[in-house]
């Protein structure tokens, strides 16, 4: 189980990303429209002004039940270990059992 502080930090990052999403997107559009490099520098500074944690690359997908960030399967929203346990307990319909 992941520490609760890590899960809360991840939620805060998601909120920041949603808050600054439009600012980042508009800045990127403006940068692509302007051909000269000297004018682009203003928009690059504007793109760097939001907090670092608002960048979408800082987000991690986490396991729904444990909060684990590694070995996450998008289709199920679970980590590999929990997914394997649920397969063996027949809690996921239509999934075939395998061992690795």
Swiss-Prot record:
InterPro entries: Ribosomal_uS14 (IPR001209), Ribosomal_uS14_bac/plastid (IPR023036), Ribosomal_uS14_CS (IPR018271)
Primary localization: plastid
Record flagged with keyword Plastid: yes
Pfam families xrefs: Ribosomal_S14
Top-level taxon: Eukaryota
MF (Gene Ontology): rRNA binding; structural constituent of ribosome
PROSITE patterns hit by this protein: RIBOSOMAL_S14
Keyword Ribosomal protein applies: yes
GO cellular component: chloroplast; small ribosomal subunit
GO biological process: translation
UniProt KW keywords: Chloroplast, Plastid, Ribonucleoprotein, Ribosomal protein, RNA-binding, rRNA-binding
Compartment annotation: Plastid, Chloroplast
PANTHER family listed in its UniProt record: 30S RIBOSOMAL PROTEIN S14, SMALL RIBOSOMAL SUBUNIT PROTEIN US14M
Subunit comment: Part of the 30S ribosomal subunit.
HAMAP family, per database record: Ribosomal_uS14_1
Family under the similarity heading: Belongs to the universal ribosomal protein uS14 family.
Job description of the protein: Binds 16S rRNA, required for the assembly of 30S particles.
Name of this protein: Small ribosomal subunit protein uS14c
Protein's organism: Jasminum nudiflorum
